[in-house]
Design a protein with these regions (language model features):
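Substrate-binding pocket helix/loop in short-chain dehydrogenase/reductase
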Residues: 99-100, 107-112, 207
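Active-site helix of classical SDR
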Residues: 123, 160, 168
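Alpha-helical segment proximal to the catalytic Tyr-Lys
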Residues: 128, 173-174, 235
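C-terminal helical subdomain
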Residues: 177, 184, 205-237, 244-246
Length: 258
């Protein structure tokens, strides 16, 4: 067990699988008490099992992050029960593929509710607790889709993740005086359940061919930077969005991807 997050309490949304699960496991391995917050209890139970089997500390809370009253209640409950709240990782996300012509407001509302509005809800709920104890960390799993690149059919998702960048910059400025840092990771093609649709449509080998690293990323390769940003080592880093994509966004054209 590591000590980089020893004594810290962290709520990680969407931690039932994929990047969220890997982040929860990594945080617990560094000494944090992890609140596994997930909408699907069975997924969260598996994350909890893996953490406890490795000797880590974690509790499971089933919550729909799109339910803002429930989200606020979760933050207040954990702060009261644990006596502190050091880290929020908003990893939960909503997805949807529709062209601009096909787009409907129900899809827009669903994606923005989880991907953007929940950032505000979590920050508003956590701020009094973090301010009282003298600081904290607020982290978001964003995406390269929107802030850096896009693709057909990703309009709602890309726009929501671009909005996350605006949130990160503004929140970093507003919360810096309270010793609360605000940062995001922008993953590229990471081998998670969320990538299943693209893998089925194009094939993993074809996707990997256009990535300079020639492979998909692993969830653990997002969890590592998350641990760093949550640690004391990153105390002077705020307002940053760090791309982790194996260089996928860099070629001028797929022709130059190698």
């Amino acid at each position: 067990m590591g000590v980089r997050l020893a004594g810290k309490v962290a709520i990680i949304t969407g931690s039932g699988q994929g990047i969220g699960r890997a982040t929860a496991i990594a945080f617990a391995a560094e000494g944090a008490t992890v609140i596994v917050a997930t909408r699907t209890a069975a997924h969260g139970e598996e994350t909890l099992r893996r953490i406890t089997a490795a000797g880590g500390n974690a509790v499971l809370r089933q919550v729909d992050i799109g339910d803002h009253a429930a989200t606020r209640a979760l933050v207040d409950e954990i702060a009261a029960t644990c006596g502190r709240l050091d880290i929020i990782v908003h990893n939960a996300a909503a997805f949807g593929r529709k062209t601009i012509e096909e787009m409907d407001h129900e899809t827009l509302d669903r994606l923005f509710n989880v991907n953007v509005k929940a950032c505000f809800t979590l920050a508003q709920a956590a701020l009094p607790h973090m301010r009282k104890q003298g600081g904290g960390r607020f982290l978001v799993t964003s995406s390269v889709t929107g802030p850096k690149v896009s693709m057909p059919g990703s309009g709602a998702y890309a726009t929501s993740k671009a909005a996350v960048t605006g949130f990160i910059h503004t929140a970093a400025i507003e919360l810096a005086a309270d010793n609360i840092t605000v940062n995001a990771i922008e993953p590229g093609y990471i081998d998670t359940p969320g990538l299943a649709g693209l893998k089925a449509r194009f094939g993993e080998d074809r996707i990997a061919h256009f990535i300079p690293a020639k492979r998909l990323g692993r969830p653990e390769e997002i969890a590592g930077p998350m641990v760093f940003l949550a640690s004391d080592e990153a105390s002077y880093i705020t307002g940053e969005t760090i791309v982790v994509d194996g260089g996928a966004r860099l070629p001028e054209s797929p022709v130059f991807a190698g």
